[in-house]
Amino acid sequence: MRQAWLVLALAIGVACSRSASSLDIATTTSVVNSGLLEAILPQFSDYRVRVHAAGSGRSLVMLAEGSAELVISHAPAAEQQALAGHSDWRYQKLAFNRFVIVGPVSDPAAVATSPGAVEAFKRIAATGRDFVSRGDSSGTHERETMFWRLAGISPSNDHLLTSGASMAVTLRQSANKQAYTLSDQATWWQLEGELPDLRQLLWDDPALLNTYALLYPVENLKAAALAKWLTEGPGRALIGAYQIGGRKAYEVWPAGCPGSLPDATVCAGSR
């Protein structure tokens, strides 16, 4: 079998010719920033995997355009919309962790004592604190937008700062601005040692559940091979074993727990 190589094509405009031995996937930036894909994909030997880190929204567009053959996404609403227009796509939940609200160590908005994420967003707005938004149709931005909506708030442009970039860039910008932000837990763990002016403030609200899914055309056998490797083969164990600072970064989707639709949630007792 051929040795697989992981190519992180962070600049999406990179031109590359597709061959029978390569597989182009587009993905949320979080599984790149967290180090997960770099850790596990070199073990996949069927094809040479080329990874385009684009954010969930852009990744789904790439799949529809044919510039990606498989997507790893964590944006259920965008996934539902994409599936509605592509009956030939297969959908399968892959793993989960949590979103976390991160902010200044001093926590001037008292997010750490908030009963939940929606109340935390209300407190951030009420105290006039800066919030750094991804602003890029990513899965993290989708969840952030949902929290603002449920809070009944249209955040002021004076206090809503848009990074338009990856989760890693957004966290660094939050540290520089002493601002709050929403992050996936794994990327935060990967960077927290570099960002002593920030701390994790809220993570235990069920609304912060963060699910990852695979989407790919049914007829694409290369994509199907990688999907099977990730969900049923050695890749599944590698995801479950991946740690950051001795902490388990992802939980694999529980066996026997329905995961064929974007609104699927983790079975009781599995979180």
Question: Model regions: which residues?
Answer:
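Hydrophobic anchor at the start of a short beta-strand
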Residues: 49
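Serine endopeptidase catalytic core focused on the charge-relay Asp
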Residues: 101
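Acidic, polar ligand-binding/catalytic clefts
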Residues: 70-96
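Exported/periplasmic ABC-transporter solute-binding proteins
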Residues: 16-46, 57, 61-67, 75-76, ...
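Residue-level signal for tight coil/turn positions that link beta-strands
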Residues: 96-98, 128
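Bacterial N-terminal signal peptides
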Residues: 4-13
